[in-house]
């Protein structure tokens, strides 16, 4: 690659007007389009999970989770006692089942999706009222998903575990 080709590719990438697209710059654009398509597909899988959770659609949730799923709750949180959860059954029993039994009106509200390759980070909030304590939960979260072949293979939760523990622990 000549210095001229590199310079033209750099100017083209910077948005310089009137600079012709070179053959050297086209593969980079093609790779960017493929990455964007992959990001969008993986984000769609994660969005489907949140929609299914909100609808109480366990069959769809189960279909989005890989059989060899590894799910990790935030350390020191009320559901981290069984970390790492292996497979959808462990997640349904150890997390979803317990939350359903312990909270009234529990909701997971994703606000921002940040896809990058096979990972999708999601920023949002949890809300609900603990049945035993009557305390309301309103905690931020970051969820980091790894998606492979249209299935969620890994999940890592980050949240305000101190708030969770305050809400679930009787005075």
Q: Model-derived features: where do they sit?
A:
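Bacterial N-terminal signal peptides
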Residues: 9-18
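Short, low-complexity N-terminal intrinsically disordered segments enriched in polar/charged residues
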Residues: 4-5, 18-63, 169-171
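Short, surface-exposed coil-to-beta transition loops
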Residues: 107-108, 136-142
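Short, cysteine-centered beta-strand-loop-beta hairpins and adjacent loop/turn segments enriched
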Residues: 128-138
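Short beta-strand edge/turn micro-motifs at domain boundaries
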Residues: 140-166
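Hydrophobic pocket/interface hotspot
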Residues: 46-49, 61-62, 69, 91, ...
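A short hydrophobic beta-strand element
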Residues: 118-126
């Amino acid at each position: 690659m000549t210095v001229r080709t590199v310079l033209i590719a750099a100017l083209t990438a910077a948005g310089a007007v009137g600079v012709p697209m070179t053959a050297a710059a086209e593969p980079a654009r093609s790779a960017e389009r493929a990455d964007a398509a992959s990001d969008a597909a993986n984000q769609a899988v994660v969005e489907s999970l949140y929609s299914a959770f909100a609808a109480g659609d366990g069959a769809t949730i189960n279909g989005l989770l890989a059989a060899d799923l590894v799910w990790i709750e935030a350390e020191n949180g009320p559901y981290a006692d069984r970390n790492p959860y292996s497979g959808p059954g462990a997640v349904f029993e150890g997390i979803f089942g317990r939350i359903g039994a312990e909270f009234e009106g529990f909701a997971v509200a994703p606000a921002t999706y940040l896809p990058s390759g096979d990972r999708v980070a999601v920023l949002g909030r949890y809300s609900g009222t603990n049945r035993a304590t009557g305390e309301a939960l309103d905690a931020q979260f970051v969820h980091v998903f790894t998606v492979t072949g249209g299935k969620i293979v890994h999940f890592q939760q980050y949240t305000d575990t101190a708030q969770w523990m305050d809400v679930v622990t009787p005075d």
